[in-house]
Amino acid sequence: DEVRISIAHTCTDYDTAKAAFAAGASHMTHLYNAMPGITHREPGPIIAALEDGAEVELITDNVHIHPAMVRFTFNTFGADRVILIADSMMACGLPDGQYSLGGQAVTVRGPRATLTEQPGTIAGSATCLFDCMKRAVLDMGVPLESAVRAATLNPARSIGIDADYGSLDAGRYGNVVLVDDKLDILKVVRHGEVIG
């Protein structure tokens, strides 16, 4: 069984991140979140990931990352290295209100989930992956083809299931979300069967 190593929620510096990638890390979880930013004197783990070919995850819920940084990431890392994720907590799809995450009280308003005791601290997301993909296209200016790839093929490849999932190539499972021109869902097909 293959193990994939990811750098996540880290205070590491550039050199330490480079050493981690040289030792086999190949992925960066929740890019930009809870990690040092990029500066000209301290490039940090983000530049190490860029240089070493790492796959990077983006939470495109209109809360975690500014749209300009999302576009920057697609443009610099390339659409084949970006993986869209939702980082959803249990409140995803539920009404605004009070929820719990790991024993901590969380307040949800729209896509924003914050610690109730620390309202400025993000506590996951209340947005599903499809809506993150939709937001990336409609609100952040990511090309549709790039956003779909980042939500389907790239994550499947990252965990080694792209022989069966992630695209509509021959021999793969027929999983499809049919949308209209506003990216609203019309139908969902799972393993070739319409389920919604």
Task: Give the predicted meaning of each segment.
Residues 1-96:
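Active-site core of metal-dependent hydrolases
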Residues 10-13, 99, 103-106, 183:
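C-terminal intrinsically disordered extensions
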Residues 45-58, 62, 74-172, 176-178:
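His/Asp/Glu-enriched, well-ordered alpha-helical/loop segment
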Residues 182-189:
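Short, Lys/Arg- and Gly-enriched loop/turn segments at beta-strand edges
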Residues 196:
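Mg2+-dependent phosphoryl-transfer enzymes with acidic/Ser/Thr/Gly-rich catalytic loops
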